[in-house]
């Protein structure tokens, strides 16, 4: 059995819960959120999926647990509290891996603080930007002629700029093999 902790039960956290419940693995899932409204959203969304393993369990709490072993923690809180939540989690629990939603933090100093916390606790952190793993992007990267400048344009509507732009920036960074990018606005 794997111990899964999801911190933040709102829109993203409840979707992570649905995905976890589809797993064939036996999971002990704990969902934490101080908002009863968010807990209610998570409960409702959990009831919409058929468990991939009938032995998996879900519990809901308002506080981060203490003195627990956690295989995977998904931190899907608002960015302005994410570093505080991470510190509270890692100072009182043993966590093997953490998946962070993006944008990670609101202050530059919090990046260094969390990296140090991850190192000190021997936890591995991941940022939820999975497009690099898609076979289409892997094949595209192999076909790109990187001897010339590469331009990318993204069009769309009804999606949050900050939430979704990071995915396109990340995939472009992956495709060109650089993390230093120049952005231009188009109207």
Give the positions of each predicted feature.
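N-terminal Rossmann-like dinucleotide-binding module
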Residues: 1-51
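Beta-strand-loop-alpha-helix segment that lines the small-molecule cofactor/substrate pocket
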Residues: 67, 71-132
